[in-house]
Amino acid sequence: MTDRTAVRTGLLTVDGATLHHEVRGEGPLLVMMPGGSADAGIYDAIAADLADRWTVATFDPRGYSRSPLDGPVTDQSPATHADDIVRLIDLLSPDGAPAALFGSSSSAVVALAALARHPGRLSRVVAHEPPVVALLPDPEAGRALFAAVREAFRQDGVAAAMAAMAAGLAPEEGEAAPGPERAASGSEQAATAEENPTPERNAEQAATREQAPAPERAPTPEQAATFRRMHANLPVFLEHVLCPFSGYVPDLVALKASAAHLVLGVGRDSRALLPAVAAEGLARRVGAGVAEFPGGHIGLTEHPRAFAARLRDVLAAT
């Protein structure tokens, strides 16, 4: 019997890149896609919890961490990333058995593209809060928000962009969804972060808080290395992933045809925010189910054990 805590690593050559992937456990295949600037390390705790039931595969997306591109980085495409996923499924499930797929935030966008493009390779897809602005009541406001975040990065760097993101997505009393005005305000507030550093404005701490679990004790050397890798991915995410992925227009016809295999996840604490509003809007449009998860948009890092337990239930539901 395979030790579910043992990690088997490998490299997969895909069109234009080489993907680092990690596999734990045994059973039906479950592929877990990291979102934002995260890599496979974001799922270390959750993957170990789920590996008693599934063969859990995680990976570094192309252009991140240990998955180098063959050439210079350019704007990324959800469709290309979706095709990468199917190549990984083909490698790990050579008998053709379909796999379950989980994605959160930007990787939830990839999950939607994968289901639309390759429905026969997927048994169940859980897309947790895909920030697809096309599904918002005001798509232009959503596009403007993420464009403002990218511009903050171009003008003032990672710290300003992360502050703009946090400000733009923060709820205000009586407001249904955030907007670009507060993203710009957040960028201005972060402009003096170098001169007046605080925990809220420190770029590395902000990136760690966004992408990695807050440990109850000092991080191990392995955890520290993971945090550094994910922080180093932020420029690629902010320049080449954020706007192309949030601007993705889902294939509603294809998703409606596969709605029985699709679940849209929303955070208990983030249902009024842009990504959850988009998720619920998509569910209504295509007739897919909605499942509430612990925490907010980054609930998988806020409450990893509770999140894993909820994901286990959602994957097991028929």
Task: Label the model's feature ranges.
Residues A82, V86, M162, A283, ...:
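Short, amphipathic alpha-helical "lid/cap" segments that border enzyme active or binding sites
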Residues V286-T318:
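Catalytic active-site module of serine/aspartate enzymes centered on a nucleophile-bearing elbow/loop
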Residues A147, A152-E280, R285-G289:
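Alpha/beta-hydrolase
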Residues D60-Y64, P131, P294-G296:
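Short beta-to-alpha linker loops that shape the active-site pocket of alpha/beta-hydrolase fold enzymes
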Residues P131-G157:
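A catalytic-pocket lid/entrance helix-loop region that shapes and gates access to the active site
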Residues T55, G96-P137:
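Conserved hydrolase catalytic core segment
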Residues T2-D3, G10-P68:
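Conserved HGGG/HGGXW glycine-rich cap/lid loop of the alpha/beta-hydrolase fold
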Residues A57, G63-A100:
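Active-site loop/oxyanion-hole signature of alpha/beta-hydrolase fold enzymes
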